[in-house]
Amino acid sequence: MSHLSQQRICSGENPFACKVCGKIFSHKSTLTEHEHFHNREKPFECNECGKAFSQKQYVIKHQNTHTGEKLLECNECGKSFSQKENLLTHQKIHTGEKPFECKDCGKAFIQKSNLIRHQRTHTGEKPFICKECGKTFSGKSNLTEHEKIHIGEKPFKCNECGTAFGQKKYLIKHQNIHTGEKPYECNECGKAFSQRTSLIVHVRIHSGDKPYECNVCGKAFSQSSSLTVHVRSHTGEKPYGCNECGKAFSQFSTLALHLRIHTGKKPYQCSECGKAFSQKSHHIRHQKIHTH
């Protein structure tokens, strides 16, 4: 440490102040690094992929992802990491430590980023917007997966029948058709599900739990997707547009029903007289003619 730096520590002198937040620093170089966070300047670019960073130390860490260099090893399982913070996060899996707790429901997480993503289930916030159709998402990874719909990319293929999907989760759902496996069973009624998330949603029927609340009117829902659709009744958002006539809808299912007007598809047929209908509700209403 230089004599000048020691003098500043002793005297309490910190002459370099951030004009944005007022935070003070003893060195101009430290202030300059701090200011990058405000103006989002990212002068340090990765030569491999072009990704930019605000500080040199971050680009050096990032470059390890390209070289495959993994110097830090977990003592429990032997898994290795190129960055210390990734190792520390990983080790919490073994210790069971979950320091980041949601103030709304008490659910705890290993990483702060996971807590932030979870909190959006309570607020309904979806900051990631698709440039093609305007649909919004709570996580960037969800947006990335959704965008494959527009470019027609379907990298996930079923080994059984060859059907391809744009998102891995849809492939996993589809594969249960072939296996018929339903490992997740409800303790209340015995109903079984192929996915854990489906069981969690189902259990709320018994518990009456509705964790997703509308910030506008206070109405609560058991599923985040139901809240998303409901919020559109306040905002007027209609992200699903018909390519034939331009009419827009707040729900994809409503668009699917509407498209049958153009295609003439009528999948619901009366077993009594053979008359066909485009909507299930119309089919049910018609059947009452035969029962009376």
UniProtKB/Swiss-Prot annotation:
Cross-link Glycyl lysine isopeptide (Lys-Gly) (interchain with G-Cter in SUMO2) residue location(s): 28, 51, 56, 173
Region (Interaction with TERF2IP): 212-292
PROSITE patterns from the UniProt entry: ZINC_FINGER_C2H2_1 (PS00028), ZINC_FINGER_C2H2_2 (PS50157)
UniProt keyword terms in alphabetical order: DNA-binding, Isopeptide bond, Metal-binding, Nucleus, Repeat, Ubl conjugation, Zinc, Zinc-finger
Pfam families in alphabetical order: zf-C2H2
Any single Gene Ontology cellular-component annotation: nucleus
InterPro entries given in the database record: Znf_C2H2_sf, Znf_C2H2_type
Subcellular location: Nucleus
Superkingdom of the source species: Eukaryota
Glycyl lysine isopeptide (Lys-Gly) (interchain with G-Cter in SUMO) cross-link site: 157, 169
Zinc finger (C2H2-type): 16-38, 44-66, 72-94, 100-122, 128-150, 156-178, 184-206, 212-234, 240-262, 268-290
GO molecular function: DNA-binding transcription factor activity, RNA polymerase II-specific; RNA polymerase II transcription regulatory region sequence-specific DNA binding; zinc ion binding
Gene Ontology terms: biological process: regulation of transcription by RNA polymerase II
Record-linked PANTHER family: ZINC FINGER AND SCAN DOMAIN-CONTAINING, ZINC FINGER PROTEIN ZFP2
Family: Belongs to the krueppel C2H2-type zinc-finger protein family.
Summary of subunit composition and partner proteins: Binds DNA. Interacts with SUMO conjugating enzyme UBC9/UBE2I. Interacts with the telomeric protein TERF2IP.
Protein name: Zinc finger protein OZF
UniProt source species: Bos taurus
